[in-house]
């Protein structure tokens, strides 16, 4: 990997087909300019993160305006395409928000059909989807009727580290084999039957759950991801990774970094912000001797079980002199043949495969 570009004052970025699109304007956080890696696209008034590249066009929202704009990336022509503000884009749907009516529209990107709900959906189904609030996760149909709900109190508390506090969802991983998988704050992995909302599998790496018959005990789960290629759940911690078979709920594969790759990833004392991308995951790393914050990143090959690449992209001398460093809320991303990561001083670092 070779560094090819640094872009300063990047507030937020998205990746699409090997290129970064980003907003920037440190003096006006609510009316930013929108850029590609090569040029300025929209000079001002773009909301921080409400922009979504879609092939030759870009959907975006302007500050204090209830509309969705479309920008033709080839011609530069900009126009209003909807009187609702775009909120999210997935492979299946585009989500728009009507702030006056407080409703969410979900438009199927293939058929153009849509439905309107008072809920924000985190998972999509042919007749509705999965939503959540502060106390429960539930399934709704396209008319907004709740078909079932699963209260978070049923997850139980953590009576060792946070007694009395109810567990909650950290990440909804996806719907696989008619099961809704999600990970929780207290280190649990849960699968619910999407038809009934009943628990099918519960795994835990939390010491508080040892001895609880309802949980299958595994090593610490860390950060969990859905892997499309084999429809599995991959869980990555600073110690190693585990692969869960979603058809059985069993542990299909595990790896301890210090045993499998002692001279590669195993030599790091701390692994942060793992980010699964296909058969690889990227990460931030530190050793006990490091000072002045995180400066190193790496890529690990899950199939080969070895470190592919690592580099200290913010050297010790720079961290000491400027207090610049990497942060766990900004992981390393792969897009095409490039790598992207943003440091604490809002500089976007771009690398390319040699």
Give the residues covered by each predicted segment.
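Secretory-pathway ectodomains
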Residues: 1-354
């Amino acid at each position: 990997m070779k560094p090819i570009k640094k872009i300063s004052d990047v507030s937020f970025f998205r990746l699409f087909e090997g290129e970064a699109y980003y907003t920037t304007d440190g003096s006006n956080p609510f009316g930013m300019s929108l850029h590609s890696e090569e040029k300025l696209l929209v000079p001002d008034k773009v909301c921080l993160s409400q922009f979504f590249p879609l092939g030759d066009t870009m959907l975006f929202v302007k500050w204090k305006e209830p509309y969705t704009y479309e920008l033709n990336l080839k011609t530069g022509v900009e126009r209003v395409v909807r009187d609702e503000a775009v909120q999210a884009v997935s492979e299946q749907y585009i989500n728009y928000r009507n702030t006056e009516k407080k409703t969410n529209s979900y438009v199927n990107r293939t058929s153009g059909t849509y439905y309107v709900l008072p809920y924000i959906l985190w998972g999509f189904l042919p007749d509705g989807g999965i939503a959540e609030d502060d106390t429960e996760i539930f399934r709704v149909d396209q008319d907004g009727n709740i078909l079932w709900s699963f209260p978070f109190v049923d997850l139980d508390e953590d009576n060792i580290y946070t007694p009395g506090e109810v567990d909650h969802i950290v990440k909804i991983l996806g719907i696989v084999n008619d099961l809704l998988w999600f990970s929780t704050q207290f280190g649990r992995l849960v699968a619910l039957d999407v038809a009934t909302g009943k628990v099918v599998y519960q795994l835990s790496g939390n010491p508080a759950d040892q001895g609880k018959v309802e949980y299958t005990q595994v090593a610490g789960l860390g950060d969990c991801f859905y892997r499309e290629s084999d429809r599995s759940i991959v869980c990555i911690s600073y110690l190693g990774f585990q692969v869960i078979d979603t058809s059985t709920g069993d542990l299909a594969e595990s790896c301890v970094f210090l045993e499998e790759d002692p001279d590669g990833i195993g030599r790091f004392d701390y692994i942060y912000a793992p980010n699964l991308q296909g058969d690889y995951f990227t990460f931030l790393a530190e050793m006990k001797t490091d000072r002045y914050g995180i400066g190193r990143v790496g890529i690990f090959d899950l199939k080969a079980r070895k470190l592919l690449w690592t580099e200290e992209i913010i050297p010790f001398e720079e961290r000491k002199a400027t207090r610049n460093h990497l942060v766990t809320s900004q992981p390393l991303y792969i897009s095409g043949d490039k790598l992207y990561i943003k440091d604490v001083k809002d500089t976007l670092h771009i690398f390319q495969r040699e």
